[in-house]
Amino acid sequence: MARTKQTARKSTGAKAPRKQLASKAARKSAPATGGIKKPHR
């Protein structure tokens, strides 16, 4: 379940990078995105 959720989230973010999705993705993998520093702080 966790793997599916992560994959789905990453897939959605890559397909349609939205502000909300990007924020959630950045929070889970801030180093991977390395783009938004606000959610991490």
UniProtKB/Swiss-Prot annotation:
Do you know which Gene3D superfamilies this protein is assigned to?
Answer: Histone, subunit A (1.10.20.10)
The family line of this record is: Belongs to the histone H3 family.
- What is the protein's name according to its record? Histone H3.2
GO CC terms: nucleosome; nucleus
The subunit structure is: The nucleosome is a histone octamer containing two molecules each of H2A, H2B, H3 and H4 assembled in one H3-H4 heterotetramer and two H2A-H2B heterodimers. The octamer wraps approximately 147 bp of DNA.
**Keywords assigned by UniProt, alphabetized:** Chromosome, DNA-binding, Nucleosome core, Nucleus
Gene Ontology MF terms: DNA binding; protein heterodimerization activity; structural constituent of chromatin
Task: List locations, semicolon-separated.
Answer: Nucleus; Chromosome
Q: What does this protein do?
A: Core component of nucleosome. Nucleosomes wrap and compact DNA into chromatin, limiting DNA accessibility to the cellular machineries which require DNA as a template. Histones thereby play a central role in transcription regulation, DNA repair, DNA replication and chromosomal stability. DNA accessibility is regulated via a complex set of post-translational modifications of histones, also called histone code, and nucleosome remodeling.
Extract the ranges annotated as region (Disordered). Answer: 1-41
Major localization listed first in the record, in broad terms:
nucleus
